[in-house]
Curated annotation (Swiss-Prot):
The enzyme's E.C. designation: 2.4.2.21
Keywords: Cobalamin biosynthesis, Glycosyltransferase, Transferase
Active-site residues, as the UniProt record annotates them: 306
Designated name of the protein: Nicotinate-nucleotide--dimethylbenzimidazole phosphoribosyltransferase
Function (record text): Catalyzes the synthesis of alpha-ribazole-5'-phosphate from nicotinate mononucleotide (NAMN) and 5,6-dimethylbenzimidazole (DMB).
One BP term from GO: cobalamin biosynthetic process
Pathway it works in: Nucleoside biosynthesis; alpha-ribazole biosynthesis; alpha-ribazole from 5,6-dimethylbenzimidazole: step 1/2
Organism: Brucella anthropi (strain ATCC 49188 / DSM 6882 / CCUG 24695 / JCM 21032 / LMG 3331 / NBRC 15819 / NCTC 12168 / Alc 37)
InterPro entries, A to Z: Nict_dMeBzImd_PRibTrfase, Nict_dMeBzImd_PRibTrfase_bact, Nict_dMeBzImd_PRibTrfase_N, Nict_dMeBzImd_PRibTrfase_sf
Amino acid sequence: MSASGLPFDDFRELIRNLPGPDLGAERAVREREATLTKPAGSLGRMEDIVAWLAAWTGKRTPQINRPLVAVFAGNHGVTAKNITPFPPSVTAQMVENFAAGGAAINQICIANDLGLKVFDLALEHPTGDITEEPAMDERTCAATMAFGMEAIAGGTDLLCIGEMGIGNTTIAAAIALALFGGTAEDWVGPGTGSTGELLQRKLAAVRQAVALHQAHLQDPLEVLSRLGGREIAAMAGAILAARMEKIPVIVDGFVASAAAAVLYAANPEAIDHCLFGHVSAEPGHRKLLEKMGKQPLLDMGMRLGEGTGAALAASIVKAAALCHSGMATFEQAGISGSK
């Protein structure tokens, strides 16, 4: 905690003073790309990805040796409003499934040689029901962000962030509405299958929550504490920690992007080291990416969470780095360049 004793002060200071990109490393990558055995620009966005890796790792030949998927799990008091077809107990059951290797994210990590860590965030203690009270007080929220910063402990050179939490698309929609305005209908989607009356209750919950806390939503970190979830606060912390340690980040779907959006609202440059792995089928996600000016890497109609979209995108990032470092130059291969 800062000397002032206010829980968020250290994070506000951090967000104001983030390290920038290494433009020299980015330039070196662009220069090497021009010499590789391919027409200029023919690898399309893969070339931009390598330049992004160089800028945020500071390495002129970026390599991905220890990629990690970090999945944060949290429960939400707002589920008491009967907004989702699944009970909150499913969150803990899915954490057990991750540990047993039985989830989709386990298979994608195996297929792409990615590490996996799962962080259980006090599942037995849901956050406050945001339609009646703040999700967290500032001290709890700040402590959870600090916990999320530990995701990079042990070392990684590419961090993919994802989540698990019954009810958390409601939370993401409330955050998006508070940060970017519009109507609840702009941001609320079916999530894990909320239709009919469930969807109407979900819409009502988002409206009620934002109206209840409206006087306290001018500061993005207060938006996080009042409307957020533990997994969302932890993901925000992980994104910040990665920035400080020169670790590029791949963000997963709607809920993970809501964590990034809090940082973006505080400082638009705070997520420049983030690549958005995919656009979810959850309708609010595309709008949220547009608000932040971010282009997703994949569009596959996915809406599972768990970091699955980020993990699939990591395979492309790994391939981009290998193409850059492993391809021969025209001179090395004895191939004539363009006239």
